[in-house]
Amino acid sequence: LSFTLNDGDFVTVIGGNGAGKSTMLNLIAGVYTADAGSIVLDGADITKLPEYKRAKLLGRVFQDPMMGTAGNMGIEENLAMAYRRGRTRTLRWGISNEEREFYKEKLQRLDLGLEGRLTSKVRLLSGGQRQALTLLMATLQNPRLLLLDEHTAALDPKTAHKVLTLTEKITSENRLSTLM
């Protein structure tokens, strides 16, 4: 398989169950090791790069709304983890007022009322709210490539439509290259 994605491209891969769509995304993310060939991102061969190092370059939203977030942590804590991904860690964990305002502004754009619930545990959110939060977390740092693994499959049709609309809005505003 060989393909090229340009900046801002949104490509949807279509195939039946077991066709290898999720496997392809897992290969790109570094979950699986490629037997042959190479994976090149922005001209750099990332084939041998470990998954945790690829995480700096990639955003990812899974099919299961429970994945991608820490359910026992608050909304702002989840956002802080995503925002700080790939950065040097310090002993300080607190969230500054500036960061909190940044998160509120980002959450407001989702139009789900989450900006007033920053300390709410993520496990208390609906599947659609959680998936929208995961999408926001995956795109906070403007990744080089956004991987969406059937991210609306577990949602009801109305909620799936809302999440897809948010996906289109976020990816087009940030010119994110996206593989779904």
Question: Where in this protein do the model-derived segments appear?
Answer:
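Q-loop/switch helix immediately C-terminal to the Walker
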Residues: 72-88
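ABC ATPase NBD coupling module
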Residues: 45-59, 67, 71, 89-96
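ABC ATPase C-loop
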Residues: 138-139
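Catalytic Walker B motif of ABC-type/P-loop ATPase nucleotide-binding domains
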Residues: 146-150
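Conserved ABC transporter NBD signature motif
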Residues: 37-45
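Helix N-cap at the start of a conserved alpha-helix in ABC-type nucleotide-binding domains
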Residues: 157-159
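Helix-to-loop junction immediately C-terminal to a conserved catalytic motif
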Residues: 29
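The feature captures the beta-strand-to-loop junction immediately N-terminal to the Walker
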Residues: 14-16
